[in-house]
């Protein structure tokens, strides 16, 4: 039964994460007629609550990974299980940055589901205070200006790219197709949210890991260490 209450990330655990990953993969495989997703079989009070989530697809090749799609929802328009299914299908087939996923790629795709809290606008008298208020490793950001400009970056992104708070703000502005210093404009709305990440350890595997954004390692540091 659908519940109007919004799921809280504190309610989530590894088993819920495993179910979300399973739903996401079945949703993608269904498009290739390799599986059938029946959401009614996922009768769980947490999954039946309305939720916000993003699904990220990574393609593994030669021991390296690259982004293959990422789509999500920041409005509580459906139960969490439906959001996971819809976001997975959109990430696989409707991300405008990539060609639609092909069936022969599935064996090399790792699925990641990030469940979000409801975004809250950050209001400050002095816009220069924004870098002092946001927290890299904890906050995700949304930048909005009018109805034409909107950009979102998940909490794990600044950790992966070793950004400080000001760079994080600038990159979110760029994601919204605005100037990097748009966050200083009082007509621009800045929102933040938190998230918890569930990720497959290998493609189509039953093992998953639960990740806090603050635990994400900087990719640049990894590259330097591997030199």
Curated annotation (Swiss-Prot):
InterPro entries assigned:
AMMECR1 (IPR023473), AMMECR1_dom_sf (IPR036071), AMMECR1_domain (IPR002733), AMMECR1_N (IPR027485), AmmeMemoSam_A (IPR027623), Uncharacterised_MJ0810 (IPR023472)
Gene3D superfamilies named among the record's database cross-references: Hypothetical protein ph0010, domain 1 (3.30.700.20), Hypothetical protein ph0010, domain 2 (3.30.1490.150)
What are the annotated disulfide bridges? none
- Pfam families from the xrefs? AMMECR1 (PF01871)
- At the top level, the lineage of the source is Archaea
Provide the AMMECR1 domain boundaries: 15-209
> Which NCBIfam families does the UniProt entry name for this protein?
AmmeMemoSam_A (TIGR04335), TIGR00296 family protein (TIGR00296)
Q: Which PANTHER family match?
A: AMME SYNDROME CANDIDATE GENE 1 PROTEIN (PTHR13016:SF0), AMMECR1 HOMOLOG (PTHR13016)
Instruction: Output this protein's name.
Output: Protein SSO0193
Instruction: Please report the organism this UniProt entry assigns to the protein.
Output: Saccharolobus solfataricus (strain ATCC 35092 / DSM 1617 / JCM 11322 / P2)
Q: What's the source species' lineage?
A: Archaea, Thermoproteota, Thermoprotei, Sulfolobales, Sulfolobaceae
């Amino acid at each position: 039964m659908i519940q109007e209450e919004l799921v809280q990330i504190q309610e989530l655990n590894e088993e819920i994460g495993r179910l979300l990953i399973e739903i996401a993969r079945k949703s993608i495989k269904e498009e290739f007629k390799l599986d059938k997703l029946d959401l009614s079989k996922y009768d769980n009070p947490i999954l039946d609550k309305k939720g916000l989530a993003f699904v990220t697809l990574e393609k593994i090749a030669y021991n390296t990974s690259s982004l293959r799609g990422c789509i999500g929802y920041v409005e509580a328009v459906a139960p969490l299980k439906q959001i996971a299914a819809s976001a997975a299908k959109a990430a696989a087939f409707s991300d405008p940055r990539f060609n639609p996923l092909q069936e022969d790629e599935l064996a090399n795709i790792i699925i990641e589901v990030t469940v979000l809290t409801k975004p809250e606008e950050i209001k400050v008298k002095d816009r220069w205070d924004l870098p002092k208020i946001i927290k890299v490793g904890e906050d995700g950001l949304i930048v909005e200006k009018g109805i034409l400009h909107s950009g979102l970056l998940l909490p794990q992104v600044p950790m992966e790219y070793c950004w400080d708070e000001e760079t994080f703000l600038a990159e979110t502005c760029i994601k919204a197709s605005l100037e990097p210093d748009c966050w200083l404009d009082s007509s621009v709305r800045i929102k933040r949210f938190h998230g918890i990440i569930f990720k497959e350890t290998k493609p189509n595997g039953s093992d998953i890991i639960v990740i806090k954004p603050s635990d994400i390692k900087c990719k640049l540091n990894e590259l330097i260490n591997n030199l």
